[in-house]
Amino acid sequence: MMKLKSAAVAAAALVASAGVAGAEKMEVTHWWTSGGEAAAVSVFADAVNAAGHEWVDGAIAGGGNARPIILSRIAGGDPMAATQLNTGRDAEDLVQAGLMTDLADLAEAEGWADFIRPSKLLDSCTYEGRIYCVPVNIHSFQWMWLNRDVYAQSGVDVPSNWDEFAAAAPALRDAGFTPLAVGGESWQISGMSGVFQVALGGLDLYRAINVDKSAEAAASPEMTRVFQAIADARGMVDDGYVGRAWNDATAMVITGKAGAQIMGDWAQGEFGVAGQTAGVEYDCLPGLGVYPVLDTGGDAFYFPKPNKNVEAMTAAQLEMASLLVSKQVQVDFNLAKGSLPIRGDIDLEAANGCMKKGLEILANPENVLPSSEQTFSGDTQGQMEDLWVSFFNDPSISVEDAQARYVEIIASAD
């Protein structure tokens, strides 16, 4: 307890030393625009406003659209006070260019390394020993969400793994349902493909490709199975998937138009806003019911160096960073978002069944994988995303040709 009090005092002193922390208008950019996301981001906004500042919302719909806009503004000398990005290498070039506020002294004063878990999250924010972002949650794409009533109406049991799901798909078609709700945005198809890689290829394959960058693993029979599953999934979607937003695909499951969706745990916030309960209206399968694992992606906030009112804005940035990792804000935000907290020292009594599954998985380090955003450069990620999207959208591309291109990408990956 004495250590915690000392850390709090040190952190307060650090914020004060950065400048006079008056009421600042803080423009915050992010891409949280769905119903569940809006409920979650309001937790952060309320905390910033309660601290005496003014949260100026800069929402930009769609992460794929938002990232280049955000990064371009910062690089072009038009910084916002704070911005959401993913944990990983999104802002690597801007950090190296010295355009981000250094949070290392605050992190040390508050003891972030003592309570942020897994430690790799903080590593993703670290460059040359200094910390430039604050992780706010743990998100993983490794989930499937299923509508229980759709399966009941189709006369089949709710699947417990991918093979059962694939076997039940014809029954759902015959009953008038779409077996798999998919959104056609590139990041959705790429993320879904990564889920197949873990669930059907196995943990060793995932690590060999995403960590060791092994072209041999990319050419393996296990990876062939992954490409075949993606090809099979083409036949489980509806004709209207192209261009569909992720939350619209989630709504298909919520409203009983589709049996399931492969999507990250942020989808859980949409079920919550709709008043649905895990284990009652919907079920969840981490790792497609095959490998219950999580990849440690998620969201982080960066604080671009201000170019006016520097001392006061820097103080406000440090105060906001401290708020984002505070215990109550972490609890309230992650319960609304459907994500897991980055703090290992809080009690989520109100967590639902799916969130508890995630917490149990997270408790075993062997079940925690780095996300591809943490291991591959933006260029390599872009090449892989282009391949996944082209393969899913174009049935004329064979499994063999797609895998051959994938091997080339991994062989030259950085």
Tell where the protein language model's regions lie, with residue ranges.
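Short, solvent-exposed loop/beta-turn-alpha elements that line the ligand-binding surface or hinge
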Residues: 104-117, 184, 200-225, 273-278, ...
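Conserved C-terminal helix/tail region of periplasmic/extracytoplasmic solute-binding proteins
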Residues: 25, 47-50, 75, 152, ...
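Conserved N-terminal structural module of periplasmic/extracytoplasmic solute-binding proteins
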Residues: 21-97, 109-111, 158, 315, ...
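Extracytoplasmic/periplasmic solute-binding protein
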Residues: 128, 132-136, 142, 166-215
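Hinge/lid segment of periplasmic solute-binding proteins
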Residues: 88-141, 192, 283
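Extracytoplasmic/periplasmic substrate-recognition and gating elements
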Residues: 24, 46, 50-51, 76, ...
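Long, aromatic- and glycine/proline-rich binding clefts that accommodate carbohydrate-like moieties
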Residues: 117-120, 282-285, 334-386, 390
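Glycine-centered hinge/linker elements that transmit conformational signals in sensory
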Residues: 169, 211-243
